[in-house]
């Protein structure tokens, strides 16, 4: 059997590289030697100088949002937080009497048979 390995893609097209990764700086040989030889410099550069292209818009995020929420939480804690036992209210309405079985009218039927009205089909001859 013959395997078809032809493709409709352009073989002469340049390789696709996303824009975020196209602007990579070309570092010198001295820099690469320093990164490989000095763990301190490698850690420093990754921690202080490296910027991941995925997280370029860090300025748009507000890191002080917790301070605003703390003020609102303190206000909410003081207002309307009285404890009410709902279980007591539920059992008071029972009355302590016997449980009543539901009446037949209230029960939903298990099987419902639709009432069919037979109609003659009139077809021309």
From Swiss-Prot:
Which superkingdom does the taxonomy of this entry point to?
A: Eukaryota
User: What does induction of this protein depend on?
Assistant: Induced by tunicamycin and osmotic stress.
A cellular component term (GO) from this record?
Answer: nucleus
Print the keywords alphabetically: DNA-binding, Nucleus, Stress response, Transcription, Transcription regulation
What is its subcellular localisation?
Nucleus
Q: What Gene Ontology molecular-function terms does this entry list?
A: DNA binding
Q: Which GO terms describe its biological process?
A: positive regulation of DNA-templated transcription
Q: What is its main location?
A: nucleus
Question: What is the purpose of this protein?
Answer: DNA-binding protein that binds to the NRP-B promoter to activate the NRP-B-mediated cell death response. Functions as an upstream component of stress-induced NRP-B-mediated signaling to connect stress in the endoplasmic reticulum (ER) to an osmotic stress-induced cell death signal. Exhibits transactivation activity in yeast.
Query: Could you tell me what this protein is called?
Result: Protein EARLY RESPONSIVE TO DEHYDRATION 15
Lineage, broadest ranks: Eukaryota, Viridiplantae, Streptophyta, Embryophyta, Tracheophyta
């Amino acid at each position: 059997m013959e395997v078809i390995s032809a493709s409709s893609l352009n073989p002469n097209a340049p390789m696709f590289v996303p824009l975020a990764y196209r602007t990579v700086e070309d570092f010198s040989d001295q820099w690469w030697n320093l990164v490989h030889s000095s763990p301190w410099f490698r850690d420093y550069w990754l921690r202080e100088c490296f910027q991941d292209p995925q997280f370029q818009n860090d300025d748009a995020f507000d890191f002080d949002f917790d301070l605003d929420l703390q003020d609102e939480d303190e206000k909410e804690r003081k207002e309307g937080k009285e404890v009410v036992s709902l279980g007591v209210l539920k059992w008071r309405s029972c009355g302590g009497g016997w449980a009543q079985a539901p009446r037949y009218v209230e029960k939903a039927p298990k099987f419902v048979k639709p009432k069919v009205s037979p109609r003659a089909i009139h077809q021309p001859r």
